[in-house]
Amino acid sequence: MSVESDLKKDGIEVIKKLDTLRVNSIARTVSNSLCETFPDFNLNQNDLFIKLSRLDMYIAKMPEGMAEANYFYKNTSIYFNDHIADEDLEEFAIHECIHYIQEIKDKRNYLLRMGLCDYTEFRIYGLGLNEAAVQLMASKVLAIPKEYVKYFNITFETTSPSYYPLECCLVSQLAYLIGEDVLFESTINSNDTFKNKFIELTNAKTFMNIEDNIDKILMSEEEIIKINNKIATMDDNSKKIDVMNKKIENLKSHITSTFIKTQKLITSIYFDNVFDSITDLEGVEKYRQKLYNFKDYLGSTAGDTFFNDYYVNKMMALEEKYNYLENTSVENVVDDSMYLTKKKTSKLLDFFNFIKSLFVHSDFENSVDIVKKWSFSRLMYQNFYNLQCLNSGNLLSLFF
């Protein structure tokens, strides 16, 4: 299919081509910004400027719901929505210029790979993962502050409130666990470092499931946009509209359930695996901090207590592991399961069981978000500690 046919199919109508001076200005700004933001990614500012200045850039009319800018690899061109102010073109060019830097083509100009996305003969893998990673990079370049948003009944904090927000939320979780620099380096240089690191800490099946689920979320969002655009052209009295609205609601429910399922998968697989690898007290503290801070990257829905329950269970298990490691030298560890030997239940363990029962059995009229719940838990622990004069002051910092 020709470029013209592709553009027509997507509803893109070219208005004008940007002149060389404007393209060079955008290329200079973007190349400078990328090199300043990511100094360790082997980006040469002069080489990058020359590369980006070879792009063709156009102003075009675009259908409702389409991204404000789009990169087309077939003719190495960027198309900007005509309602973008000229002084804002650089901002929207960053995401698309990263796509251009990412692309790997064969001798016949067929796209093989773009960052974290693989293009095979029959299917594209990792499109949602790559789009989210690129958007997170663009947000970092632009220094966009975090803000709370709510989409499809999911509330979360993000630096990308308008573009791929749900996908960015999930990929931010991966970046936190594996390392933001690892994610971004693999994204812009189109390599498997991030993928391999994640698989090393989890497994290949989990990576593929996460990758596939993020793609499903992206495709469902795109389908909703297409249906809404079609509804906009129909008579308000058309019976088909009811059917189409029902389909939209089903897609929204699918997006929500897929997001929550993926988030639970990321949480449980990663932290379960890392927990099993803890061999010293320093590892216990690092694990505690990482799991606690992970709450800041999560999306939440009304009535969902998964992370609360998971955190309490892991803190109880972590105390057992702490006690075992404190009393057993690493050299004497024969079987990791030894620390599970039945011990006398501590007051701290009793406390966490009590907190867990509150989360599991209480019937709140209004859902309390994760942060408030854990602030409450911390206060409860401190009060419990002060009242009971627990002989475990060293564990206060361990758990909070």
Range-by-range predicted roles:
Residues 10-77, 82-87, 107:
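Auxiliary, metal-adjacent structural segments of Zn-dependent hydrolase domains
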Residues 97, 255-270, 274, 352, ...:
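Extended low-polarity, hydrophobic cluster-rich segments
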Residues 111-117:
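Extended compositionally biased segments used for macromolecular assembly or nucleic-acid engagement
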Residues 117-163:
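Post-HExxH zinc-binding segment in Zn-dependent metallohydrolases
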